[in-house]
Amino acid sequence: MALAKRIIPCLDVDNGRVVKGVQFENIRDAGDPVEIARRYDEQGADEITFLDITASVDNRDTTLHTVERMASQVFIPLTVGGGVRTVQDIRNLLNAGADKVSINTAAVFNPDFVGEAADRFGSQCIVVAIDAKKVSAPGEPGRWEIFTHGGRKPTGLDAVEWAKKMEALGAGEILLTSMDQDGVKSGYDLGVTRAISEALCIPVIASGGVGNLQHLADGILEGKADAVLAASIFHFGEYTVPEAKAYLAARGIVMR
C-alpha cells in the first residue's frame, strides 16, 4: 500500500506578511499569514509550512505571536522555521502551537543540534531544511551544494551526503528547496529531489519551482518526493488545493 502523498502550501513570512520571491530575491506581498493559512486549512491542505525568511539573516527569533494566532485558527499540522538556533527556540515554537520545527542554517553550524533536538522532542517534529544549488557542469553527474542564510552563503557541503547525515542524526523529514528553481515556475529540480529521496528512508518534501499542477505530479512520480510544497500557484489564485489534489489523484497518486 503506497503511503498517501501530501500537498503543503508554504508561507514565506517577512515582517508579519506572506511574501513570494524569485530565486530568493524580488519579493512580492501576498497577504496576512493567518488569513492565508486559514484559507488553506478550509481548502483541505494536508499541512502548512511557515518560514520566517529573514529571521536567520537578521538574527531575530521567529514571530511567536504570529505562530500562536495561526495555530489557534488552523487545525492541520503546522511546520515553522526561520532563526531556529537553540533547543529553547524549538520549545517556544512547539509551545506556541507548531507541530514541527524546521532547522536550516543552525544545522550546518552545529549538526549535533539536530540530534539533540530529535532526542529531546522526537524525530517526528524535527524537519531539516536544505537549500541546494546545482554546482556540477553540464554533462557531469549531478552535484548539488548546500547554501545557508536564506541562500546567501555557500557551504561546500554536498546536498545528498548532508541529507544522509541529517537522517542519521535523527531528522524526521527533509524539506528540500532547489534555489535554482525557486519561484521560477518551471518545475522542481527533479535530479536533486530524486537523488535525496532515493538515498533516504525518511520523507522528503520537494520545494522550489512549481508553476502548474503537472509539476506537483512530477515531483512525486519522477522526483520520488513524499510531499510537494508550493507557494505562488496557491497564493495568487492560479490553482486551489482541491484542484491540485484532484489532478494528482487522476494520475494515480494516492492522496490524503
Curated annotation (Swiss-Prot):
GO biological-process terms attached to the record: L-histidine biosynthetic process
Origin: domain of life: Bacteria
Record: active site: D12, D131
Main location: cytoplasm
Gene Ontology CC annotations of this record: cytoplasm
Compartments (UniProt record): Cytoplasm
Catalytic activity: 5-[(5-phospho-1-deoxy-D-ribulos-1-ylimino)methylamino]-1-(5-phospho-beta-D-ribosyl)imidazole-4-carboxamide + L-glutamine = D-erythro-1-(imidazol-4-yl)glycerol 3-phosphate + 5-amino-1-(5-phospho-beta-D-ribosyl)imidazole-4-carboxamide + L-glutamate + H(+)
Pfam families per the UniProt record, alphabetical: His_biosynth (PF00977)
InterPro entries, alphabetized: Aldolase_TIM (IPR013785), His_biosynth (IPR006062), HisF (IPR004651), IGPS_HisA/HisF (IPR050064), RibuloseP-bd_barrel (IPR011060)
Record keyword Disulfide bond present: no
Keywords: Amino-acid biosynthesis, Cytoplasm, Histidine biosynthesis, Lyase
Molecular function GO terms recorded: imidazoleglycerol-phosphate synthase activity; lyase activity
EC numbers, comma separated: 4.3.2.10
Pathway: Amino-acid biosynthesis; L-histidine biosynthesis; L-histidine from 5-phospho-alpha-D-ribose 1-diphosphate: step 5/9
EC top class, as a word: lyase
The family this protein is said to belong to: Belongs to the HisA/HisF family.
NCBIfam families, sorted: hisF (TIGR00735)
HAMAP family: HisF
Quaternary structure and interacting proteins, as annotated: Heterodimer of HisH and HisF.
Function: IGPS catalyzes the conversion of PRFAR and glutamine to IGP, AICAR and glutamate. The HisF subunit catalyzes the cyclization activity that produces IGP and AICAR from PRFAR using the ammonia provided by the HisH subunit.
Name listed for the protein in its UniProt record: Imidazole glycerol phosphate synthase subunit HisF
Organism for this UniProt entry: Stutzerimonas stutzeri (strain A1501)
GN (gene name): hisF
